[in-house]
Amino acid sequence: MKMKAKWLPIAAAVTAALASQAAFAVDFHGYFRSGVGVSTDGSMQTGLSDNAKQKVGRLGNEADTYGEIQLGSEVFNKDGKTFYVDSMVAMTSNGSNDWESTESKFQCTSANGTALDGCENKEDATFALRQFNVQAKGLLGFAPEATLWAGKRYYQRHDVHISDFYYWNISGAGAGIEGIQAGPGKVSFAWVRNDRSGTNDGWTYNDEMNVNTLDLRYAGIPLWQDGSLEVGVDYAIANPSDAQKDSANAQYKNAKDGVMLTAELTQGILGGFNKTVLQYGTEGYSKTFAFWGDGSWYGAEAKDGADGFRIINHGVIPMGNSWEMGHQLVYGVGNDMWDTNDKWETMSVVARPMYKWDDFNKTIFEGGYFKDKNKSTNGTSEEDAGYKLTLAQAWSAGSSFWARPEIRVFASYLAQDKKEMKGNAFNNGTADDTWNFGVQAEAWW
């Protein structure tokens, strides 16, 4: 009897935990990609350009291990009012070893373990808290269908999947009201913090500048059959501290607020879709369009009067029973972003046709080309350009373009056409082309 009595508290705790689990069912979602690859000179080389996979496509052009784990649960539901708690952690690494952690280590050491001069103190893996927020419905009498939210979250992100290119994404810590029915569409408003730091766009200043983004969107506007429109405005408020205003750094003192306007037309085609996007921005948003940004960072240091625009067309369209095609066209411009800059242009073309042999077996080709041009105020200009060609054989859980999990074997050829700004991109700066071979898995759920 004593033994039975000893286990009673444990049994009660387990029972309570199971009951709690039943009462608050947990939603489990995630994403990952990982694999192995080599190039003609060591491990895979993907540095054709800055933002290379966004410019020439991601297939056979990703050398990392990346994952997201999302857990969420509706913790309250009564009288039409609900509260949902959402969370997500993410990790990234280069996949070079079995044990990859955040433990700091030196890349090279002497015999006694002392770091040698010029060696980098490095971590194998990086972990990040991507989402932690509360979403509540039914609380607003004037809009019971709307969601009141606060915390850190992915916020209405717009992207091109084949290049992993996010072009409208102010995700971060903030608050807002989402999905207010207004006529044929829905209105959303958010306030999100997007500080300018040295991790954005290679900016070299260590002292972060506070930037707050106000976002207003009107989505789901019906136009014609299978056609809809979404429009939005983002207002970035540069908020330097008193110390930054008094510093000798003019980029802090002279930081200006900026506006980004976005319009996205979506057209359904043959069971697929095509999107055309027009964006215009002032001040720091000029750098967003020149350097493949999405609105989640603001180039507050841009010269007073800078502006820019971007045109995007992308989609995935079925072509008969056996073929599907994904594509991307991008043209972006930034004007007068710094003292010697007159105009920066960037353009990209990516196409990914896919042939389905059966419900689980497909062959994929992806080709991409890009060009960057920097024109200076003295009339001179520099250009970088290059391309990628990838052939892959894939096995996936279904025949759709979007079917995942997927395992793919690939071969990629990357080459530079022009290298006036970057120089040789491969083989430690000695070559302008390379081959990559590898195997990759990708899944979302």
Curated annotation (Swiss-Prot):
GO CC annotation terms, alphabetical: cell outer membrane; pore complex
Superkingdom field: Bacteria
Instruction: Please give one Gene Ontology molecular function term for this protein.
Output: maltodextrin transmembrane transporter activity
Membrane association type: Multi-pass membrane protein
* Cleavable signal peptide: 1-25
Provide the reaction this enzyme catalyses.
beta-maltose(in) = beta-maltose(out)
In this chain's numbering, which residues are marked as the site (Important in sugar transport)? 166
Keyword vocabulary terms for this entry: Cell outer membrane, Ion transport, Membrane, Porin, Signal, Sugar transport, Transmembrane, Transmembrane beta strand, Transport
Site annotation (Greasy slide, important in sugar transport) points to 31, 66, 99, 273, 402, 444
- Outline what the protein does: Involved in the transport of maltose and maltodextrins.
What is annotated about its quaternary structure and interactions? Answer: Homotrimer formed of three 18-stranded antiparallel beta-barrels, containing three independent channels.
- Give the family this protein belongs to, as stated in its UniProt record: Belongs to the porin LamB (TC 1.B.3) family.
Full protein name: Maltoporin 2
Which species is the source of this protein? Aeromonas salmonicida (strain A449)
Biological classification of the source = Bacteria, Pseudomonadati, Pseudomonadota, Gammaproteobacteria, Aeromonadales
